[in-house]
């Protein structure tokens, strides 16, 4: 599973950390690989945003060792490329030259919300981002387990 947002410092690392936590709780760490990337290189090598780190710490979820990186062509090897908003989907498909690939999709299209995950870089609302990421990750994990029953 690869989570993608613009800078890879707010939304996608939050989703990555939440998904890792859910996978660990279920004893699936050796079965499901999780990472995140950004379509922009503006923050490459940086730790997650302070607001992301603080919200996850408050919820008992670690961001230790996480560093942002830009999307690369080898990321097409992931089975699920989960983008935080419609712009991320478009840019990811262009960058990976995978315009019709159904494994690249908008995160909340898995949920009843069917909307973009608002970027807390602009909104300042890390709580909303956290809640949407938890819902999306839980739904995505159930989908993965349904599609890969042998896990």
List the model feature ranges, each with a label:
Residues 3, 83-84:
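Short beta-strand scaffold positions
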Residues 12, 85-86:
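Helix N-cap/beta->alpha junction signal
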Residues 80, 86-151:
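Phosphate-binding/catalytic loops
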Residues 1-78, 142-151:
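Conserved active-site segments centered on acidic
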